[in-house]
Amino acid sequence: MAKGEGHILAQNKKARHDYHIVETVEAGIVLTGTEIKSVRAARIQLKDGFAQIKNGEAWLVNVHIAPFEQGNIWNADPERTRKLLLKKREITHLANELKGSGMTLVPLKVYLKDGFAKVLIGLAKGKHEYDKRETIKRRDQERDIKKQMKHYNAR
């Protein structure tokens, strides 16, 4: 866990499988009252989400936050785009990295830090199919080695 990182509410495990993560940035999220209650209850899905930069602002798109059960009329649209809180130089740096390079911004995890919801955004480049197979093969080999070492040390 990174320094100062709190309770993890949601993780995007598929992102690390589908992308090479080049750089990570922590950002705050602008949420309504009922949305933060749903996030605290870990009712958030990052699977299809991504971030984009429009007009000098960062936005989180396609992240599903389930409606709060007791929220009734105050519930917002679960799929709405949400503003990300980043410093201006961070936004310009990310915008420069994204220009024409085949890179994208993916949310990696959502967690609470000092009572505020934060999202860890990864600057990522898509993996090819053979890269994914290679990652799976390497993981299986490491698992087999650990299993054999455990069996060997048990004697």
From Swiss-Prot:
Biased composition (Basic and acidic residues): 135-147
GO CC, one annotated term: cytosol
Annotated stretches, region: Disordered: 135-155
CDD domains: SmpB
A GO biological process held by the record: trans-translation
Localization per record: Cytoplasm
Cited function: Required for rescue of stalled ribosomes mediated by trans-translation. Binds to transfer-messenger RNA (tmRNA), required for stable association of tmRNA with ribosomes. tmRNA and SmpB together mimic tRNA shape, replacing the anticodon stem-loop with SmpB. tmRNA is encoded by the ssrA gene; the 2 termini fold to resemble tRNA(Ala) and it encodes a 'tag peptide', a short internal open reading frame. During trans-translation Ala-aminoacylated tmRNA acts like a tRNA, entering the A-site of stalled ribosomes, displacing the stalled mRNA.
Classification via InterPro entries: SmpB, SsrA-bd_prot, SsrA-bd_prot_CS
Primary localisation category: cytoplasm
Gene responsible for this protein: smpB
Family named by the database record: Belongs to the SmpB family.
Keywords: Cytoplasm, RNA-binding
Listed name of the protein: SsrA-binding protein
GO MF annotations in UniProt: RNA binding
Organism: Streptococcus pyogenes serotype M1
Signal sequence residues: none
Keyword Nucleotide-binding: no
